[in-house]
Amino acid sequence: MVRKLGIEEELLLFDPESGEVVPAAPSVLKEFREHGPGRQRARAATDELDQELFRHQLETRTDPVRRAADALDQLVAARRTAGEAARAAGYAAGACGIVPLGGDRSVVSPNDRYRDMVDTYGEIARTGGTCGMHVHVDIGSDEEGVAVVDRIAPWLPVLVALAANSPYVEGRDSGYASWRAQVWARWPSAGPTEQFGSVAGYREVCRMLLDVGAARDPGMLYFDARLSTGQPTVEVRVCDVGTDPAVAVTIGALVRALVETAAEEWADGRPAAHWRAEALRAAHWRASRFGMADSLVHPLARGLRPARSVVAALVEAVEPALAAAGDLELVDVQLERAVNDNGATRQRAAFERTGSVRGVVDDVIARTEASWQDHDSHAGRL
């Protein structure tokens, strides 16, 4: 049976007049509860929209689904809900990996856990208001999940490059395609992991990180791929949020295919290829720095190859799983957009057109809002 997948996205809240972020999440969530779909369905706001670490952020999520088309419909619906609630409250929602221009990023959401994170981790937390996309994929057991995490690690930098959507920070070009990835890597529990080898090995590492305070709770074990807390999934956390939901679902399909392929290798008794953490970090840095604009580390050749050929190698490695899930055509059609024109490329093109990072913000907002407006005209088609 095809594994279910779910997608979480984090969005920024902007002042549409200045282009700066604003701590508007309480106002937007209030609008959603009182006047939006949350009130009409008599559902809690957290079912579709939720607060994040800072008040200039919102989180959206889909349900676990088997069909990529259903994931797209839900992802677009969640974006529409967030965007319309933001506009009704006088703001705008935008899908961007990091704050590109400025604004008030200091207001922590009213949550004891979030306040404790800032108290404990200081500047790492205070500058940690980034926006990612997380993909969840079903697993049959913790044993299978750890085997998957051990096997997919070398491929995750390819996803970093495809999803890169955060070149601008503090009104300037960072020089990176995904500056969010570098900011996120500051957390003491974040980043790629060497092989755990077993559930016991995984739990031992988790316990040590918790014991020394590198994470305050299991939800703060920010491995690039981890076993989810409270649900039987592997969660991949390496991607920037992007403006194009079809590309997001395509990346979700690739993650699902990676999980399925790795699980089959484990079930067949094939060992995981060993990678040192230093090599994985170098591959991640390369993907974050250049995105799709230069060479990437090829997980099979273990050397630099043109980014396009590394993406092709990923698709080839998981092609049977993509076909079995009915996702091969989706990937063939949509992946070309991420290869040729990912978020970082679009943001830099917007800067070239407008001559300002404010113009980049306007473009991010416009593309984010178009992502549900365009979908309405051809719903269900990928």
UniProtKB/Swiss-Prot annotation:
GO terms for biological process: modified amino acid biosynthetic process. Pfam families: GCS2. It comes from the Bacteria. InterPro entries: GCL_type2/YbdK_subfam, GCS2, Gln_synth/guanido_kin_cat_dom, YbdK. The keyword Cell inner membrane does not apply. It is an enzyme of class 6 (ligase). Keywords: ATP-binding, Ligase, Nucleotide-binding. One of its GO terms (molecular function) is glutamate-cysteine ligase activity. It catalyses: L-cysteine + L-glutamate + ATP = gamma-L-glutamyl-L-cysteine + ADP + phosphate + H(+). Its EC number is 6.3.2.2. The keyword Ligase applies. ATP-dependent carboxylate-amine ligase which exhibits weak glutamate--cysteine ligase activity. Belongs to the glutamate--cysteine ligase type 2 family. YbdK subfamily. This is Putative glutamate--cysteine ligase 2-1. It comes from Nocardioides sp. (strain ATCC BAA-499 / JS614).
